[in-house]
Amino acid sequence: MPISSKFNQRVRARLEEDEFEQFSGESTSDEGLEGGESVEDEEEQEENSAEDHSEEDDDEGEEDDDDDGDVEDSSSDINPSLNAISFGALAKAQASLGKRKRPTASTGGISPKRAKVPGRHSPTPSASSSGEKQEPEPELSEYQKHLAANAKKPPQKLTHRTSKHAPTIQSSRHAVSRKRTILEPPPVPKARDPRFDSVVLSHSTNGNSSTASNAAIHARKNYAFLDSYRKDEIAQLRKQVSTLQTKKHKTNYDERELARLKRQITSMSDRQRTFERKEMEREVLVQHRRKERELIREGKKSQPYFLKRGEVKKEAVAKRFTEMSGKEKQRALERRRKKVAGKERKEMPWGRRVVE
């Protein structure tokens, strides 16, 4: 309820009493005294009502922002008969307005309750303020709001796979490639030798793992002559490489053929070394199992000890070194030394890589 309406009510009440006193001059003195007492009672009631209204205004002032702006417009609506209002009512009204207009240092003119409520507009400056207009806060753009929202979110870390056989973990925000396969060519048929196929071996042994391993061992023994064929093929390829290297006038075809032969020799030799390493590990494992059985039969051990994969590899390397000749050992040690030195050089800082 605006203050101007309250002032109008009080003015009307006092005017009615004054007019009544002026026109009732012929009445008795007792009636005049009673009228004066009634006027004083009405003034006290009006002051009490003004106090109640001022307290209500203090409570409602924190929720209504438009009351402060209406104070300036109320001055033009007040009648010129404000001189009849009592000074006590004016002082109380001024005190209530002073409490509502007093700015705070933390909120800059906004009440503490109003400062806590988000989305509220700052109150309009009143007539009792210093006259300085508060500058409106600049509105953030949508892009800035988006950046602020993303900045508050903690970065999500992808958990690592439990093992190398687990599926790859990838974020759902990963961009999909724009390349699409329209026509998929038919798969190229691969040659499969049933003698060494694990599917055929497991099917022939009715899924028994031990029997399948024995079948693979027997197949390896039965076709051991293929190793000699591979060695002969590698020797023939090396002869072709030597003839091409000694050729004086080399064409582009000769250069390409020489590079192809070198790649083929490297691939076949690596495959041959892999076969030999696996055969060595298998022999180490067979010998260990044989020793464990003998110890259990003699009663020296109650349970066998099963070698781990790393232990099998270490024993296979030691056995291979014992079977090597002097020159082969030196070559193997030199290759090992160069390999370790290369790893250390990669881990070394750039400033220390230069040899003084």
Curated annotation (Swiss-Prot):
Basic residues composition bias: residue spans: 154-164
Organism, as annotated: Ajellomyces dermatitidis (strain ER-3 / ATCC MYA-2586) (Blastomyces dermatitidis)
A GO CC term attached to the entry: nucleolus
InterPro entries with a match to the protein in the record: RRP36 (IPR009292)
Pfam families, sorted: RRP36
Subcellular location: Nucleus, Nucleolus
Location of the region described as Disordered in the Swiss-Prot/TrEMBL record: 1-216, 322-356
Basic and acidic residues: bias regions: 322-333, 341-356
Keyword Ribonucleoprotein: yes
Protein name as annotated: rRNA biogenesis protein RRP36
Skewed-composition ranges (Low complexity): 202-216
Segments of skewed composition (Acidic residues): 28-75
Physiological role: Component of the 90S pre-ribosome involved in the maturation of rRNAs. Required for early cleavages of the pre-RNAs in the 40S ribosomal subunit maturation pathway.
Family: Belongs to the RRP36 family.
Gene that this sequence comes from: RRP36
Assembly description: Associates with 90S and pre-40S pre-ribosomal particles.
Keywords tagged on the record: Coiled coil, Nucleus, Ribonucleoprotein, Ribosome biogenesis, rRNA processing
Coiled-coil features, chain-numbered ranges: 230-278
GO biological process terms on file: maturation of SSU-rRNA from tricistronic rRNA transcript (SSU-rRNA, 5.8S rRNA, LSU-rRNA)
